[in-house]
């Protein structure tokens, strides 16, 4: 009796206590050849038919060589499921474990509760004996901490969330309300829906979001208070998990609030589908083969046989435990067998049989049921395994569905509001914002009131908006019939995301600011602004089709020409100008050298005319070289030698080419249009090179900023420009005009507009990062399709083109920049001022030089006068000295002559007359100023012996024969007359003492 009590108590304690299990003894192991040849399979079944079918299936299995190896036999050991879980535990120990069962198949009546299958799972799991359930669908059995060896051929209830997602994707519903009970299964289905949707919507275009979660206590009596919240929500699609009893209460109260009629969509689980007051049009799910115990029994047996066969071929299987009273039993083979069972994937009577890590059935098929009149259930679709794609597939025949209110057309699934909260932002030319004056009470006809969003200051809310987007909004509201309240962005930003971690989770959450943040947080219904469509924004909001296609471009100020004072120097580079200047003087020097060293250049010929041109000197050579280059007439100073003249011709050809090239390039620089841009586009090396002194920027947190973040090849450029980014586009454009910013990168539409109204601005390069402007809406907004269709119609009708001409190209104030650019520029004083300044410099230089020359000449004249005075004094002194010498010589000769006459009067002698006019001194001019004093006839007569004695003797011989006698000056003088004045006749003597000075 004591032993029986111990056996009875052991399994009961095993339900709550986990014992430490000692390692299995090595002696209990078997080699592959020592594997058991017989395997007992236990069955805890709900009725006799199931027991009989279980036995029959085991017998048939033994003849199936595909699943049963040779020398292996299976036997069945069955017991009846008892509603009392304690009795069930005793029966499992006494009738199954005592017979060494390797696994247990368990089923129960659906109306009897799940406590008995749980008792079987606890008891078998304590000894690591695998349990295969064929009817238990509660979420609790998925917990492997409790049901360590339990797996099932039916899916749990919460797996219906997977089917919900497929149905929502099929019907394109994007916003739902989930209603669930607060028990384990209700919370499990909510968690499954939220978890699976995270990965499910990566593969589909339409993403469903949960707008409202309604949780209720089981066995409720009224659902009215929850319906009030549901009625104010926007979604009209209800996903409900509830028991049959709770579903009756919910459907009853929902009908009273008219929430089961037209426009509403109910998708429920299996239990709620069987409520006796399920409204017409409700869609529900029903598991295929849910009540086919025979099919599940067969599938479970064959899954078990398949696992044992593979295990036999791979490892040793120890015998199953036999004694429930042995607390030291730890059947490792049972644990390994459980792993083999979870890896099975076979095609059975109930479909494709496979399990997840929790041992729950996957690939289970469902029928989509549509409730019609008188609670008739009509199958309108199937969720089944597609063997070709190896995954589940949803097939629904929409034409067979009758929706609530007996409608054949699919409801929108959302309450469509007709009065919308709209936001916009100031961005020329799409939205112009004007503050109303103090005496104004309303906006102009083409304007709309646009106060600041959520701003309580009444004076700050008086704004009027007009522009491209406002005209589009006016036409759009007329086309799809809605009213609106328009407001301005409170912070003036389109919005960007900030990564935050408020919950301590591993992943960071994006929080949006600006217009996008208002839309994401559902404080606004629509954004009508030049909102660029990009992946980051599209993840959180909806976009209509683009109302304007555009891209990103670069705005810069048109490059100005070089300094106007030296415009005429632009045709040649500085290097070329220097080379020309050097060439002029080098050629001049070579010309001079050639002409100087040429035998026909420097020296005149003996027979040449006295008027022959002078030889070329260095200054004349420089003058010649400059004259040829500047095409001026050369009247003198040309080369004389042939070699120099050849060089002169070559230099003339060089000058012709240089002058012609200069003239052509001067026309190109001064007359033709100036260059359009400095940059070639986004691929310009000056933008990509971070070391280049070039400032570029965009707007912080804008779509352009996000584009640069995404592009890896632009990362270096983005890091450079990030510090220069502006808060608004208006500030950046003003800095471009002022020259503070060299390149502003922004949306092409805005920059083309700015360039069209200011001829000093220009867009550089081709568009990149092409996208479009769209109207932003909340995720799942019912207005998305209507807005998109209206915009497409606007494109087809030409309305959008009309807006482009009116606002983008700025027709009413646009300057004709294109005509201005194509008209040839005429040269004026501004362009040629440098040439006139050069002439002025030349004139000033000439005047300066002449002043210097005059001053220098005056200095030279003074110096020359001093030299002339000194020379005259010297000449006078020299003349006086020579006169004295002459007189003395004459006196000496006179004395000698007189002595000779007195002593011996030699015949034939003649007195020599010294006539100053006839015989002047060497270098002395003839004239009365040179007459001797006291000589009235200005002639001194002396006797000339050569005339009297020796007529053939020359004066030089006479001077040599008579020392001391001065030699008369011979040269270009008149011939001596033979007749002398009487005073100086031969033999005439006179006193010459008066001649002594």
From Swiss-Prot:
Tissue expression, as annotated, is: Highly expressed in adult heads: in the brain and ring gland. Low expression throughout the entire brain is also seen. Higher expression levels were observed in some scattered cell bodies and part of their fibers, including those from several pairs of DPM (dorsal-posterior-medial) neurons surrounding the calyx, DAL (dorsal-anterior-lateral) and DPL (dorsal-posterior-lateral) neurons in the lateral protocerebrum (LP), VAL (ventral-anterior-lateral) neurons in the anterior protocerebrum, and two pairs of VP (ventral-posterior) neurons in the posterior protocerebrum.
Segments traversing the membrane? 574-594, 652-672, 832-852
Question: Does the UniProt entry include the keyword Nucleotide-binding?
Answer: no
SMART domains registered for this protein in UniProt? Lig_chan-Glu_bd, PBPe
According to the record, glycans are attached at 258, 314, 345, 397, 454, 481, 501, 693
Biased composition of type Polar residues is found at: 987-997
One GO biological-process annotation of the entry reads: regulation of membrane potential
- Protein family membership: Belongs to the glutamate-gated ion channel (TC 1.A.10.1) family.
Q: How does it assemble?
A: Forms a heteromeric NMDA channel with Nmdar2.
The protein's name is Glutamate [NMDA] receptor subunit 1
Mind giving the lineage of the organism this protein is from? Eukaryota, Metazoa, Ecdysozoa, Arthropoda, Hexapoda
Q: Which gene is this protein's source?
A: Nmdar1
């Amino acid at each position: 009796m004591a032993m029986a009590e111990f056996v009875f108590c052991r399994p009961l304690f095993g339900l709550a206590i986990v014992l430490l299990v000692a390692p299995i003894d090595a002696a209990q192991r078997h080699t592959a050849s020592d594997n058991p040849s017989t395997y007992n399979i236990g069955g805890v079944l709900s009725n006799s038919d199931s027991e009989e079918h279980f036995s029959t299936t085991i017998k048939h299995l033994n003849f199936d060589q595909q699943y049963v190896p040779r020398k292996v036999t299976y036997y069945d050991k069955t017991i009846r499921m008892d509603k009392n879980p304690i009795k069930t535990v005793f029966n499992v120990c006494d009738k199954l474990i005592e017979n060494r069962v390797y696994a247990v198949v368990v089923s129960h009546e659906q109306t009897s509760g799940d406590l008995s299958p749980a008792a079987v799972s606890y008891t078998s799991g304590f000894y690591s004996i695998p349990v295969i359930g064929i009817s238990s669908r509660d979420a609790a059995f998925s917990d492997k901490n409790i049901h360590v060896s339990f797996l099932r051929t039916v899916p749990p209830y919460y797996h219906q969330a997977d089917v919900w997602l497929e149905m929502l994707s099929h019907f394109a519903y994007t916003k739902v309300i989930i209603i669930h009970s607060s028990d384990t299964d209700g919370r499990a289905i909510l968690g499954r829906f939220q978890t699976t949707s995270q990965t499910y919507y990566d593969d589909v275009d339409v993403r469903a979001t949960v707008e409202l979660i309604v949780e209720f206590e089981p066995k409720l009596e009224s659902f009215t208070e929850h319906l009030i919240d549901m009625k104010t929500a926007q979604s009209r699609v209800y996903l409900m998990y509830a028991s049959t009893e709770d579903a009756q209460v919910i459907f009853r109260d929902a009908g009273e609030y008219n929430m089961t009629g037209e426009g509403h969509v109910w998708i429920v689980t299996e239990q709620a589908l069987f409520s006796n007051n399920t409204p017409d049009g409700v869609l529900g799910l029903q598991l295929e083969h849910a009540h086919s115990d025979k099919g599940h029994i067969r599938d479970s047996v064959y899954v078990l046989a398949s696992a044992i066969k593979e295990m036999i071929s791979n490892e040793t299987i120890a015998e199953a435990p036999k004694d429930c009273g042995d607390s030291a039993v730890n059947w490792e083979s049972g644990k390994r067998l459980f792993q083999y069972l979870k890896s099975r994937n076979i095609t059975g009577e109930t479909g494709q049989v496979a399990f997840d890590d929790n041992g729950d059935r996957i690939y289970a098929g469902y029928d989509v049921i549509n409730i019609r009149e008188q609670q008739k259930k009509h199958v309108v679709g199937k969720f089944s395994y597609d063997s070709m794609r190896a995954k589940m597939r949803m097939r629904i025949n929409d034409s067979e569905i009758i929706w609530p209110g007996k409608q054949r057309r699919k409801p929108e699934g959302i309450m469509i509001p007709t009065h919308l909260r709209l936001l916009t932002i100031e961005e020329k030319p799409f939205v112009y914002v004007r503050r109303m004056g103090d005496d104004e009470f309303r906006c102009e006809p083409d304007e709309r009131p646009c106060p600041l969003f959520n701003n309580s200051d009444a004076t700050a809310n008086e704004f009027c908006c007009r522009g491209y987007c406002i005209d589009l909004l006016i036409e759009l509201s007329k086309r799809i019939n809605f009213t609106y309240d328009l407001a301005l962005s409170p912070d003036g930003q389109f919005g960007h995301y900030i990564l935050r971690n408020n919950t301590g989770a591993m992943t960071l959450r994006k929080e949006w600011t600006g217009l996008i943040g208002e839309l994401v947080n559902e404080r606004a219904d629509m954004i009508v602004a030049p909102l660029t469509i990009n992946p980051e924004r599209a993840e959180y909001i909806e976009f209509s089709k683009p109302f304007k296609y555009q891209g990103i471009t670069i705005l810069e100020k048109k490059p100005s020409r070089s300094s106007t004072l030296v415009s005429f120097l632009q045709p040649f580079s500085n290097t070329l100008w220097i080379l020309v200047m050097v060439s002029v003087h080098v050629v001049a020097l070579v010309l001079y050298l050639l002409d100087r060293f040429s035998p026909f250049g420097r020296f005149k010929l003996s027979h040449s005319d006295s008027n022959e041109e002078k030889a070329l000197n260095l200054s004349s050579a420089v003058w010649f070289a400059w004259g040829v280059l500047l095409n001026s007439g050369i009247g003198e100073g040309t080369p004389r030698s042939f070699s120099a003249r050849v060089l002169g011709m070559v230099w003339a050809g060089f000058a012709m080419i240089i002058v012609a090239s200069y003239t052509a390039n001067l026309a190109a620089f001064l007359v033709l249009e100036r260059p359009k841009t400095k940059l070639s586009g986004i691929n310009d090396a000056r933008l990509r090179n971070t070391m280049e002194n070039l400032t570029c920027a965009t707007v912080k947190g804008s779509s352009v900023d996000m584009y640069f973040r995404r592009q890896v090849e632009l990362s270096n450029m983005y890091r450079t420009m990030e510090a220069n980014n502006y808060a608004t586009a208006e500030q950046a454009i003003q800095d471009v005009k002022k020259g503070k910013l060299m390149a502003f990168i922004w949306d092409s539409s805005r920059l083309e507009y700015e360039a069209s109204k200011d001829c000093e601005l220009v867009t550089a390069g081709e568009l990149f990062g092409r996208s479009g402007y769209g109207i932003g809406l909340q995720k799942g907004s019912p207005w998305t399709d209507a807005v998109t269709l209206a915009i497409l119609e606007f494109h087809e009708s030409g309305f959008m083109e009309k807006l482009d001409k009116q606002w983008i190209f700025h027709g009413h104030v646009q300057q004709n920049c294109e005509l201005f650019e194509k008209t040839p520029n005429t040269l004026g004083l501004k362009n040629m001022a440098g040439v006139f300044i050069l002439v002025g410099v030349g004139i000033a230089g000439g005047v300066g030089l002449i002043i210097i020359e005059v001053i220098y000449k005056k200095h030279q004249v003074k110096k020359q006068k001093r030299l002339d005075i000194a020379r005259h004094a010297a000449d006078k002194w020299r003349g006086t000295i020579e006169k004295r010498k002459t007189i003395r010589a004459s006196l000496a000769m006179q004395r000698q002559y007189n002595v000779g006459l007195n002593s011996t009067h030699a015949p034939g002698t003649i007195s020599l007359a010294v006539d100053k006019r006839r015989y002047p001194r060497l270098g002395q001019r003839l004239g009365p100023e040179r007459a001797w004093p006291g000589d009235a006839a200005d002639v001194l007569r002396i006797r000339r012996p050569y005339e009297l004695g020796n007529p053939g003797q020359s004066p030089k011989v006479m001077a040599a024969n008579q020392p001391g006698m001065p030699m008369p000056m011979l040269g270009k003088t008149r011939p001596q007359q033979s007749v002398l004045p009487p005073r100086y006749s031969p033999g005439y003597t006179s006193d010459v003492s008066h001649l002594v000075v």
